[in-house]
UniProtKB/Swiss-Prot annotation:
Its cofactor is Se-Mo-molybdopterin cytosine dinucleotide. Reversibly inactivated by selenide and sulfide. Not inhibited by cyanide. Belongs to the xanthine dehydrogenase family. GO terms for molecular function: iron ion binding; nicotinate dehydrogenase activity. Heterooctamer of NDHM, NDHL, NDHS and NDHF. Dimer of heterotetramers. Binds 1 Se-Mo-molybdopterin cytosine dinucleotide (Se-Mo-MCD) cofactor per heterotetramer. The cofactor is bound between the NdhL and NdhM subunits. The lineage of its organism: Bacteria, Bacillati, Bacillota, Clostridia, Eubacteriales. This is Nicotinate dehydrogenase medium molybdopterin subunit. Catalyzes the hydroxylation of nicotinate to 6-hydroxynicotinate. Also active against 2-pyrazinecarboxylic acid, but inactive against other nicotinate analogs. Transmembrane segments: none annotated. Its EC number is 1.17.1.5. Most stable at pH 8.0. Unstable at acidic pH values. It catalyses: nicotinate + NADP(+) + H2O = 6-hydroxynicotinate + NADPH + H(+). Pathway: Cofactor degradation; nicotinate degradation; 6-hydroxynicotinate from nicotinate: step 1/1.
Amino acid sequence: MKKRGKGVGSMWYGIGNTGLPNPAAAFVEIHGDGSANVMFGAADIGQGSGTAMAQIAAEELGLDYEKIHVTWGDTMVTPDGGATSASRQTLITGNAVILACRQAKETLAKTAAEKLDCAPEELSFRDNTVFITADPERSMTYGELMAAMKAAGRMAVGAGSYNPNTTGLAPENMSGIPFEVYSYATTIAEVEVDTETGEVDVLKVVSAHDVGTPINRSMVEGQIEGGVTMGQGFVLMEEIEVNTKNGAIKNPSMSKYIIPSNRDVPEIHSILVESEGGPGPFGAKGVGEPALIPMIPAVVAAIEDALGTRFTHTPIMPKDIVAAVKAQEK
């Protein structure tokens, strides 16, 4: 017999290291052709941080994305970015990139103000040009501005570093400000359980995430889809088998330690809940671990809803389902 159930999982997640210093830095240099090189140490492990930092720099400098060249993770030339963990890189390295861009823009604005006969604070940077905000017709292209910079013997370079505004936790009552910003999410999962074989199919998932202002919508959606899939494996497949006599792992290879494949991935609907004003770059928040976390309780709750049985461990393997069904029948 096959039974269906639905479950909900919600979470909040602090971005970055808990109350500990975890800074990151970035360098920016703008070249004579109006392109820019952005350098930072953060490792892109597939989540797309290199693309995100390029987009952040392009937005802050007012340049096309194609004009931004990124160098990351090269310890010979890039500044320290800290670990790619705790969903921290968008917030911390992203802000470092913005600060580096702003430092470079100070020299750019000084030179442009001299040429356009205005104060530096009257200028805006957009669409590969610098212009007077109140009179956009009075403008210079980046190429013209960089030529003026060269003639004046100036360089458009910047360095920025960012450390979240946190405090450590007081040992007597654990009070403090452990995180500068939090992400929130809720995931709903629908499953179908085969009571004879114990197999569980995840049919459909809806996952809504507070993302602040997304830097790249498609990458955020992909991050959520990846987290949902990892959560599915966490609950239903990824069982570490240990030899109790010697402590050795009995399934140490990917052929025996099973993770989801494309055929296992359910229908996933990602919902990006946007908000403004947060401390991240343009209000952005990280969606690394948050993409995974609520999927786990959602699937567990859906199985419990289908069977009417409580589970207190993961993974929930077919043998566990069959055992629970037999226990109900007694």
